[in-house]
Structures are given as structure tokens and as C-alpha cells.
Amino acid sequence: MGKVRALRARVHRAAVRPDGDSAPGPVPRAVEPALPQSPAGGAGAKDWTFVHNDIFARTQIDPSALVQRLELDQRSVVSLKRGAEPKAILPKKEKLKLRRERWLQKIEAIKLAEQKLREERKRKAMVVVGDLHPLRDALPELQELEAGRQRQQARRRVTSKPRPVELSRMTTVQRQQLLEEERTRFQKLLASPTYRASPLLAIGQQLAHQMQLEGGKQL
């Protein structure tokens, strides 16, 4: 059997009036509707409470208050940020075309940046060609370099120890010096007019002169 609930009267409270205004009359109390009697002994029976249907009978609403208009200065910040114009819906082909144009612009920008970088590297690596006379005057001549080299070699020969006659007692540097001297002497002999006239006579004179020099060194 269902629960029996107490019925509470639902009555609107009297309106609050300022002092001095007398109430037009006593507020009539709402008549409580009679509850329908639930059948006795019915399993799963429910109690139904009927509420007064005319609850907004005394409510007064001005029709002008229902009409509202959204002005531009009264818009919210969100609506202003979004913009008044709605976004146009583009077809798929137009979207792909716009995306392709954006990609082409990005690729072109990357190419321009790389080209500028290459040109800058070229300018840095390029040698400035101008008047070479001051540079040529500042550099020493080849003859002066050769003369200085010969003087250095002569000083080394004077300061160094006397070279032994036997090859077995010579060092590697001394052997190289001996070979260089012999090569120079042989080239001078080939370039001399005496060798062109009589090679055997020129070679004999050169050997005799060399033997005299070596004999004088030994003495």
C-alpha cells in the first residue's frame, strides 16, 4: 500500500504594500481540492495530488518588455572579436587551391633566403682585385731570395764541422749535400763550351781540378 502524504495548501502570499495603503479586502484562501480516495486493498496504488492549474492568473507582464533589440554598443567583447560577418564556406577545391598557394609562398621564401645566404658567402670568399703594384713592391725579388739562401748555406758550411771524405762516415745530411754539389757541378760542366767542343777533355780537367781540391783539403 502506498504512503499517505499530507496535503499542503499552496497559496500565493499577499503583495507587500506601502504604509497608508489599505488592503482592498481580505485575501481569499484557496480552496483545497478534494483528494480522490484510493481503492482499498489495491496493490501498488498511488496517491495523486492535483495542483491548481491557474498559478499565473495574477501575474502582469508588460508586452513591451518582451521586445528586445541588440544594439552595436551593447555587444559583448567575444562577438566583437569574432566579427560581424560570418565566414564564407568554401568548397573543397577552393580550400586545396588556397593551401597550395600558401605552400608555394613558403617554398619561395625559403629559396630566397638560401639564395641570399649563398650570395653573401660568395661575397665573403671573393678576393678584391685591385692595383697589385704596391703588393709587388712590398714583396722581395726572386734574386734577393736566392742570394739570401746562398748566404745562409755558406754560413752553415762555415760553422758546421768539416765533412769527412769517406761516405761511410758521412751523415745523411752530409750525403745529401754532397749529392747536391755533384749535381750542380755536373750541370755546369754540361753547359760549358769546353764540354761541347771536347767532352772527354772537359771531364778530365774537371776530375783533375776536383782531385786537387780534395788533396788540398786533406793536407
From Swiss-Prot:
Function per UniProt: May be involved in ribosome biogenesis.
Alphabetically ordered keywords of this record: Nucleus, Phosphoprotein
Organism: Mus musculus (Mouse)
Entry protein name: Ribosome biogenesis protein SLX9 homolog
Main location: nucleus
Bias type Basic residues, positions: 1-15
Keyword Amino-acid biosynthesis applies: no
Positions carrying Phosphoserine: 38, 192
Parts of the chain that traverse the membrane: none
Disordered, as annotated region: 1-43
GO biological process per UniProt: maturation of SSU-rRNA from tricistronic rRNA transcript (SSU-rRNA, 5.8S rRNA, LSU-rRNA)
Family membership: Belongs to the SLX9 family.
Gene (name only): Slx9
UniProt-annotated location(s): Nucleus, Nucleolus
GO CC terms, sorted: 90S preribosome; nucleolus; preribosome, small subunit precursor
